[in-house]
Amino acid sequence: MSVHKSFERTHFLSYCQFLYKTDSTYDSKQVDRLNRHRHVEPESAEFLANIATIRQPKKVLEIGTSTGFSTLWLAYGLRHQAKYDFISLDIDKSRSEAARQHLQNTGLSDSVRLIVQDAFIFLNSNEDVFDLIFLDAERQFYLDYIEGLHKALDIGSVLIVDNVISHRDEVCAFLAEFTNDSRYICHTLDVGAGLFMAVRQEH
C-alpha cells in the first residue's frame, strides 16, 4: 500500500473536518443508533494517526470501517511508510463504499484494503499477526472476538478500543479479558470517548 500522488495535507485536514461535521449532523437526526455512522472523536482520530506514525506498523487491521473517518486518519498516519498492509473491515457494504469514496477524495485510495465481512468470521479464519488493531464496532459482539484477537496479536502488537469511558459498562467484561491477562500491559486513556490500549508483551 502507498499514498496516492494526489494526496495533499491541507485538503485532507479540511476534508476530515467537513466529513466529521456532516456525519455528526446526520447522526443527530437518526433515532435508531444502528443507522448512525458514529465516528471516533477528532482527538481520538489524531491519536490513532500518531500511534500509526510512531509505531510504523507493517500490518494494520481496523474492525468497524463505518464511512471511513478513523480509516482516513490511520491511513494518514501510515502515509510515510514505503510498504504496509492496512485492512479495514465492515459488515455494511454501503458504508464501506462510502469510505472508499472518501479515501479516493483525499488521495488515499491506494492505502487501504476495504473488506465487507463479519469480523467474527474474519478473525476466526485469519492466520496473520497484526502490529496494530483498532476496534470500534458493535460492542455486544466484542466478547466473541476474544480468541481471534489473541491469535492476531503477538509481542509488540497493539490493540486500541474506542468508547471505553463513554460506554464503560458495555465493554468492561471484554476489557477484563486483557487487563487480567499477564501477556498484556493495558492502559485506559482519557482521549475522546475513552481509548483502551493493550500492548502484548509475551507469547
Regions found by a protein language model. Give the residues of each.
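A short alpha-helical cap/connector motif
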Residues: 1-132, 139-160, 165-203
